[in-house]
């Protein structure tokens, strides 16, 4: 018996039962991170207002901030036009979304002419990860 909420029928999970989830700062629009959700993670996120993802490496639910304290409170949950990507507009507790101690996981920018371009780190570490994860 399917116990999914009715709205879940509009969500197009991939063959692995996952959907990409973009976390965006609700105040300034900065993209913080991209993760994955399965049905359980999406349902729990919608029910609790706290971001829950699916960790592909650990093969379990990942309640954002469970180890670091850097939780994400969801202010708005959206589904894209094809139903295959979700957008979470969040308040990022502590201002750090990335496991590297930065505000965003998108801290490297491609710089230089096309033939010799390289990735350059452009955003600072706000807190040493050694002091975040114990």
From Swiss-Prot:
Recorded metabolic or biological pathway in which this protein acts: Amino-acid biosynthesis; L-histidine biosynthesis; L-histidine from 5-phospho-alpha-D-ribose 1-diphosphate: step 3/9
GO BP terms, alphabetized: L-histidine biosynthetic process
Cofactor: record remark: Binds 1 Mg(2+) ion per subunit. Binds 1 zinc ion per subunit.
Keyword Hydrolase attributed: yes
Record has Hydrolase as a keyword: yes
Reported cofactor(s): Mg(2+); Zn(2+)
Location (main, coarse): cytoplasm
Keywords for the protein's UniProt record, in alphabetical order: Amino-acid biosynthesis, Cytoplasm, Histidine biosynthesis, Hydrolase, Magnesium, Metal-binding, Zinc
GO molecular function: magnesium ion binding; phosphoribosyl-AMP cyclohydrolase activity; zinc ion binding
Residues the entry annotates as binding Zn(2+): 81, 98, 105
Domain of life: Bacteria
Enzyme Commission number, as recorded: 3.5.4.19
Catalytic activity: 1-(5-phospho-beta-D-ribosyl)-5'-AMP + H2O = 1-(5-phospho-beta-D-ribosyl)-5-[(5-phospho-beta-D-ribosylamino)methylideneamino]imidazole-4-carboxamide
Entry-linked Pfam families: PRA-CH (PF01502)
Function noted in UniProt: Catalyzes the hydrolysis of the adenine ring of phosphoribosyl-AMP.
HAMAP family in UniProt: HisI
Protein name: Phosphoribosyl-AMP cyclohydrolase
Organism the protein comes from: Bordetella petrii (strain ATCC BAA-461 / DSM 12804 / CCUG 43448)
């Amino acid at each position: 018996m399917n116990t999914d909420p009715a709205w879940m029928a509009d969500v197009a999970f991939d063959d692995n039962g996952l959907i990409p989830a973009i976390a965006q700062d609700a105040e300034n629009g900065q993209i913080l991170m991209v993760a994955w959700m399965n049905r359980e993670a999406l349902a729990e996120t919608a029910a609790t207002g706290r971001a829950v993802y699916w960790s592909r490496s650990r093969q379990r639910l990942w309640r954002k901030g469970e180890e670091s304290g850097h939780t994400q409170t969801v202010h708005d949950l959206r589904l894209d036009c094809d139903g295959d990507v979700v957008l979470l507009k969040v308040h990022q507790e502590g201002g750090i979304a990335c496991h590297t101690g930065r505000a965003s996981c998108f801290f490297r920018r491609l710089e230089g002419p096309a033939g010799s371009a390289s990735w350059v780190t452009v955003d600072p570490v706000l807190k040493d990860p050694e002091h975040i994860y114990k």
